[in-house]
From Swiss-Prot:
One of its GO terms (molecular function) is precorrin-2 dehydrogenase activity. CDD domains: SUMT. This is Siroheme synthase. The gene is cysG. The lineage of its organism: Bacteria, Pseudomonadati, Pseudomonadota, Gammaproteobacteria, Pseudomonadales. Its EC number is 2.1.1.107, 1.3.1.76, 4.99.1.4.
Length: 464
């Protein structure tokens, strides 16, 4: 190990930065965030750097470097493109036994800057010892996606009770066991969900010796339209910690595979006129599982609040006092249209977009047809495949031109994506001709003509 990782408390300490350009600015931002008082020396200094120095209560010296500039400084940064000058600064600092960092010159450094994941007070540093800084940054980027921003709040919560817990448990092993329970249980879950007051209440109960009562929790998570890369960071984290998963037909297998391996999986999918599990039973199942203390993942295709009946499910949870979180997903209209190269709005073609359920009830579709035939709007029909002949007939009957551009997107955003474009009048024929099946999204509007120019993702097959 060439460099020993240490964390330096710079608050109120004077730090010398030699250089006034972009590199000096980047380093100075980090130093200012850590509370350092900046002394910047350079013949020319960028305006943003000037403001940063003034904000830190530091000083600007518009001239060349002098060794006396090191006086009173606890850390030295050389950030110029003048190699002899950088070497001189390094030599002067080392002679005085003051830590020095020379940007992009590890051999001249006694300290180096790592790539940082900041979840203050939790801070993670990644370093390659200056050998491969790009690799360190890539690893940091991965950590940024894995560690929620709320981890800092969790660390802050623990800090407020640290002294009290130390008094209760003088033995280090007991303290470790206490905090492991906190960080792996319902207290951490509440804090990470943004429910800080509830997390603090549970921690107070635990500190006072009462076993904190916390029922399980339900995570209502939107799985997006199919491509796993479209999941949010929060969705992935909750998928990895759930004890049981209730999922529907629209959740792609590749997404389901990202759930915790040992989690129980329960299929509650619904097809038209064939509800594998009635909605009221799904609602009750969520309540029952949560009351058993389990972390329950309700995984829904698309977004749970857009034709997903997510509102009904959390109404039931709220009625029973079950904690829940809602994680939005990319809805099918947005995801599938983007992957098909069809912008839903465009100033030359459509100034509004409507998301419409095409699901028939008793063989009819009770929609405000007159509103749907207005100009400069895009219509997106969910679950519209079965009722497509009626939808097309009614739109044309109420004034939408039969030659209005239209598209069918089957299994959008996945490797099996198929896109077929034509006209409003053509859609029913296209379904039969190409054996289109659910899940398929229907888009009607002038924006469809842009697909030929804007398409970028091709799945199994597409046809115009």
């Amino acid at each position: 190990m060439e460099f020993l990782p240490l964390f330096h408390n710079l608050r109120g300490s004077r730090v010398l930065v030699v250089g006034g350009g972009e590199i000096a600015l980047r380093k100075s931002r980090l130093l200012a965030d850590a509370g350092a008082v900046l002394r910047v020396v350079a013949p020319q200094i960028e305006d943003q750097l000037r403001e940063l120095v003034q904000g830190s209560g530091g000083e600007l010296m518009l001239r060349g470097y002098q060794e006396a500039d090191l006086d009173g400084c606890t850390l030295i940064i050389a950030a110029t493109d003048d190699e002899p000058l950088n070497a001189q600064v390094s030599s002067d600092a080392k002679r005085r036994c003051v830590p020095v960092n020379v940007v992009d010159a590890p051999a001249l450094c006694s300290v180096i800057f790592p790539a940082i994941v900041d979840r203050s007070p939790l801070v993670i540093a990644v370093s390659s010892g200056g050998d491969a800084p790009v690799l360190a940054r890539l690893i940091r980027a991965k950590l940024e996606t894995w560690i929620p921003s709320t981890y800092g709040q969790l660390a802050g919560l623990a800090a407020r009770f640290r002294a009290q817990v130390k008094g209760l448990y003088p033995d280090v092993q007991q303290r470790r066991a206490f905090w492991e329970e906190v960080f792996q249980g319902p207290i951490a879950d509440r804090q990470l969900a943004g429910q800080g007051d509830e997390a603090e209440r549970l921690l107070i109960e635990k500190v006072n010796g009462a076993p904190p009562y916390a029922p399980g929790e339900v995570y209502l998570v939107g799985a997006g339209p199919g491509d796993p890369d479209l999941l949010t960071f929060r969705a992935l984290r909750l998928m990895q910690q759930a004890d049981v998963v209730l999922y529907d037909r629209l959740v792609a297998p590749a997404i389901l595979e990202l759930c915790r391996r040992d989690a129980e999986r329960i299929y509650v999918g619904k097809r038209r006129a064939d509800h594998a599990v009635p909605q009221d039973q799904i609602n009750q199942q969520l309540v029952d599982l949560a009351k058993q203390g389990k972390r329950v993942l309700r995984l829904k295709g698309g977004d749970p609040f857009i034709f997903g009946r997510g509102g009904e499910e959390i109404e039931e949870l709220a009625a029973h006092g079950i904690p829940f979180q809602v994680v939005p997903g990319i809805t099918a209209a947005s995801g599938c249209a983007a992957y098909a190269g069809i912008p839903l709005t465009h100033r030359d073609y459509a100034q509004s977009v409507r998301f419409i359920t095409g699901h028939l009830k008793n063989g009819t579709s009770d929609l405000p047809w007159q509103d749907l035939v207005g100009p400069s709007q895009t219509l997106v029909f969910y679950m519209g495949l079965i009722g497509l002949p009626i939808i097309c007939e009614q739109l044309i009957k109420h004034g939408r031109a039969a030659d209005t551009p239209a598209a069918l997107i089957q299994q959008g955003t996945t490797s099996n994506q198929r896109v077929f474009t034509g006209t409003l009048a053509d859609l029913p024929r296209m379904v039969a001709e190409h054996e289109v099946h659910a899940p398929t999204l229907v888009i009607v509007g002038e924006v469809v003509v842009l697909r030929e120019k804007l398409k970028w993702f091709e799945g199994a097959q597409s046809q115009v």
